[in-house]
UniProtKB/Swiss-Prot annotation:
First-level EC class: transferase
Gene from which this protein is expressed: coaE
Protein name in the entry: Dephospho-CoA kinase
Pathway: Cofactor biosynthesis; coenzyme A biosynthesis; CoA from (R)-pantothenate: step 5/5
Molecular function (Gene Ontology), one example: dephospho-CoA kinase activity
Function: Catalyzes the phosphorylation of the 3'-hydroxyl group of dephosphocoenzyme A to form coenzyme A.
Catalysed reactions, semicolon-separated: 3'-dephospho-CoA + ATP = ADP + CoA + H(+)
Species annotation: Pseudomonas fluorescens (strain Pf0-1)
Length: 207
């Protein structure tokens, strides 16, 4: 089957917690690039009225719903971390729906290329939707320091998140481009701008 000509050229953008991938994504947005965040898509598919939320409530019971009918993420997170089989059930339900939601929003792109930002780009298989992978990397201690400064969380929780994500080595081995974000924001912006011009060339836009 031929690929539709209007399908956008897609860059996958990923990085571990505290790496700076959100700051990089925001600068691509500032440069006029259409960005779809997989975390947002994951929230959209479980909004009230969507079929996935009804299936989750039916499977786990009413305790995973808040009084206003929205998903109680903390309650659900506790259930799936305690029972791995339940996590697998949830992933089997949500991953295809999230991929569908992402594809829909990527197809709306009017910019020369589009970006899929996902912390689990590699682990979830979402990289298959992209033509190229950019990894924002940072030394682990810097990841921890940034996350502790940004979030109301403990170092133990940050370490748990790091363990759940792909290792730095695995992410980098899958990357086409890597930015080691261990300097200031101005430097990160300059790297994003350099890559932006490169991606314009690759995608057939103006450089």
């Amino acid at each position: 089957m031929n690929t539709p000509v209007e399908k956008p050229w897609i860059l996958g953008l990923t990085g571990g917690i505290g790496s700076g991938k959100s700051a990089a994504a925001q600068h691509f947005i500032d440069l006029g690039i259409h960005v779809v965040d997989a975390d947002h898509a994951a929230r959209w598919v479980v909004e009230p009225g969507r079929p996935a939320l009804a299936k989750i409530a039916e499977h786990f019971g009413p305790d995973v719903l808040q009084a206003d009918g929205t998903l109680d993420r903390a309650a659900l997170r506790k259930l799936i971390f305690e029972v791995p089989e339940q996590r697998r059930w949830l992933e089997a339900l949500l991953h295809p729906l999230i991929a569908e939601e992402i594809a829909h929003h990527l197809a709306l792109a009017k910019s020369p290329y589009a970006i899929l930002v996902s912390p689990l780009l590699i682990e979830s298989g979402q990289y298959a939707m992209t033509q190229r992978i950019l990894v924002i990397d940072a030394p682990q201690q810097l990841q921890i320091e940034r996350t502790l400064q940004r979030d109301q969380t403990s170092e133990q929780q940050v370490q748990a998140i790091l363990k759940a994500q792909s290792s730095r080595e695995d992410r980098i081995s899958r990357a086409d481009d890597v930015v080691v974000n261990d300097r200031d924001l101005a430097w990160l912006h300059s790297e994003v701008e350099r890559l932006h011009h490169f991606y314009l060339t690759l995608s057939g836009g103006q450089s």
